[in-house]
């Protein structure tokens, strides 16, 4: 499962809280179903996070196993065995991850996120072939170049399912120009808080 999370400024506030809750529920569901879950957050730039690796590291930490990021490898790496265990026998190698949702801010561009999504669908050793893809966004995203949209349709035709969760104000009247590229888009409407 790929989750593409819009972290642009338009998702600040209530949409941010809704998406944070959705990510937590998706993590739990993916773990219950024993499915990989990969998060790509995007605004102008992108960042990819393996949510299942993050959860596994958190569980290991709770039972007393120290997790060592590859960026924190000690200079005296001779103290590590060939299987990556620290000299105490309690270290575990992993790629750096994050422990919280990304910062919300900036504009929105789907180009980099789509390139990263396509790369993972193509080049991840058949691990994510035909994976389900879920976008959590307000879909106020400028259309990328036509060749990217054509590629999007190719994936859809070959079995990849694309879903969206559109988070918008209850008075939103903007048409969703992305709907033809997705199998289904669910809409969550919220009423903005009024301050008197």
Short names for language-model regions:
Residues 26, 150-155:
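Catalytic-core regions built around general acid/base machinery
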Residues 14-15, 144-146:
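Conserved ATPase-coupling elements of RecA-like P-loop NTPase cores
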Residues 47, 55-134, 140-144, 165-176:
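Von Willebrand factor
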Residues 1-22, 138:
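MIDAS-like acidic motif and immediate structural context at the N-terminus
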Residues 112-115, 173-196:
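C-terminal helix of von Willebrand factor
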Residues 18-32:
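An active-site-proximal "capping" alpha-helix that borders the catalytic cofactor pocket
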């Amino acid at each position: 499962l790929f989750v593409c999370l819009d972290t642009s400024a338009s998702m600040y506030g209530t949409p941010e809280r809704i998406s944070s809750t959705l990510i937590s529920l998706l993590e739990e569901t993916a773990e219950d179903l024993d499915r990989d879950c990969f998060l790509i957050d995007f605004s102008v730039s992108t960042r990819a996070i393996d949510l299942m690796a993050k959860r596994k590291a958190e569980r290991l930490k709770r039972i007393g196993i120290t997790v060592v990021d590859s960026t924190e490898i000690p200079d005296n790496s001779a103290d590590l065995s060939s299987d990556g265990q620290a000299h105490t026998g309690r270290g575990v190698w992993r790629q750096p991850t994050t422990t919280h949702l990304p910062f919300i801010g900036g504009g929105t561009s789907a180009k980099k996120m789509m390139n990263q999504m396509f790369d993972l669908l193509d080049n991840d050793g058949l691990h994510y072939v035909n994976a389900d893809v879920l976008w959590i966004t307000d879909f106020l995203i400028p259309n990328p170049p036509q060749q990217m949209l054509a590629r999007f349709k190719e994936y859809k035709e070959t079995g990849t399912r694309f879903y969206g969760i559109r988070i918008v104000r209850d008075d939103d009247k903007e048409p969703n120009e992305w709907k033809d590229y997705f199998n289904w888009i669910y809409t969550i409407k919220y009423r903005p808080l009024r301050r008197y």
